[in-house]
């Protein structure tokens, strides 16, 4: 794993939920694990899974899968939140992201982890209240919400933390009273134990 901050052991109380956020990509897949409970959020770890462009696609996807399995094994998340693929002009790039997304969904399905997918604008709205917010605004608020010393880097890791926080705001705020509930109506596709 390529963690970008100090890892923290997850809490042990039954009222705590652990969410892993994922920003999928073949070259770099961002991940961020947060803990929600008692009206607060806590960052457990974040980082990026980097693959080598000179390796076959199958080997790169296997590396993403294996690293995600390690993250799951260590932090035992109950929920996963994934940023959806946006329509890009570059078809090749979109296909690469789709491949990485498939590996993410498989890794979660194998461990019976519920998965939710959020559109980029829904993530921005959940964090800032503005669907067209700038990336820097989102990152700054993620830093504040998770009580981090600095804005998370690289961007893929920050995006992964943002989608994890979005899941709390959209689907868990009534239980954990964390942040605003303004985004409950945002677009989200839920997958419960492999069933859509």
UniProtKB/Swiss-Prot annotation:
<dbReference type="GO" id="GO:0006281">
    <property type="term" value="P:DNA repair"/>
</dbReference>
<comment type="similarity">
    <text>Belongs to the RuvC family.</text>
</comment>
<dbReference type="GO" id="GO:0000287">
    <property type="term" value="F:magnesium ion binding"/>
</dbReference>
<feature type="active site">
    <location>
        <position position="23"/>
    </location>
</feature>
<feature type="binding site">
    <location>
        <position position="156"/>
    </location>
    <ligand>
        <name>Mg(2+) 1</name>
    </ligand>
</feature>
<dbReference type="GO" id="GO:0008821">
    <property type="term" value="F:crossover junction DNA endonuclease activity"/>
</dbReference>
<keyword id="KW-0540">Nuclease</keyword>
<feature type="binding site">
    <location>
        <position position="83"/>
    </location>
    <ligand>
        <name>Mg(2+) 2</name>
    </ligand>
</feature>
<comment type="subunit">
    <text>Homodimer which binds Holliday junction (HJ) DNA. The HJ becomes 2-fold symmetrical on binding to RuvC with unstacked arms; it has a different conformation from HJ DNA in complex with RuvA. In the full resolvosome a probable DNA-RuvA(4)-RuvB(12)-RuvC(2) complex forms which resolves the HJ.</text>
</comment>
<keyword id="KW-0460">Magnesium</keyword>
<dbReference type="GO" id="GO:0005737">
    <property type="term" value="C:cytoplasm"/>
</dbReference>
<keyword id="KW-0963">Cytoplasm</keyword>
<dbReference type="GO" id="GO:0003677">
    <property type="term" value="F:DNA binding"/>
</dbReference>
<keyword id="KW-0227">DNA damage</keyword>
<dbReference type="InterPro" id="IPR012337">
    <property type="entry name" value="RNaseH-like_sf"/>
</dbReference>
<keyword id="KW-0255">Endonuclease</keyword>
<dbReference type="InterPro" id="IPR002176">
    <property type="entry name" value="X-over_junc_endoDNase_RuvC"/>
</dbReference>
<dbReference type="InterPro" id="IPR036397">
    <property type="entry name" value="RNaseH_sf"/>
</dbReference>
<feature type="binding site">
    <location>
        <position position="23"/>
    </location>
    <ligand>
        <name>Mg(2+) 1</name>
    </ligand>
</feature>
<dbReference type="Pfam" id="PF02075">
    <property type="entry name" value="RuvC"/>
</dbReference>
<dbReference type="GO" id="GO:0048476">
    <property type="term" value="C:Holliday junction resolvase complex"/>
</dbReference>
<keyword id="KW-0378">Hydrolase</keyword>
<keyword id="KW-0238">DNA-binding</keyword>
<keyword id="KW-0479">Metal-binding</keyword>
<dbReference type="GO" id="GO:0006310">
    <property type="term" value="P:DNA recombination"/>
</dbReference>
<comment type="function">
    <text>The RuvA-RuvB-RuvC complex processes Holliday junction (HJ) DNA during genetic recombination and DNA repair. Endonuclease that resolves HJ intermediates. Cleaves cruciform DNA by making single-stranded nicks across the HJ at symmetrical positions within the homologous arms, yielding a 5'-phosphate and a 3'-hydroxyl group; requires a central core of homology in the junction. The consensus cleavage sequence is 5'-(A/T)TT(C/G)-3'. Cleavage occurs on the 3'-side of the TT dinucleotide at the point of strand exchange.</text>
</comment>
<feature type="active site">
    <location>
        <position position="156"/>
    </location>
</feature>
<protein>
    <recommendedName>
        <fullName>Crossover junction endodeoxyribonuclease RuvC</fullName>
        <ecNumber>3.1.21.10</ecNumber>
    </recommendedName>
</protein>
<keyword id="KW-0234">DNA repair</keyword>
<feature type="active site">
    <location>
        <position position="83"/>
    </location>
</feature>
<keyword id="KW-0233">DNA recombination</keyword>
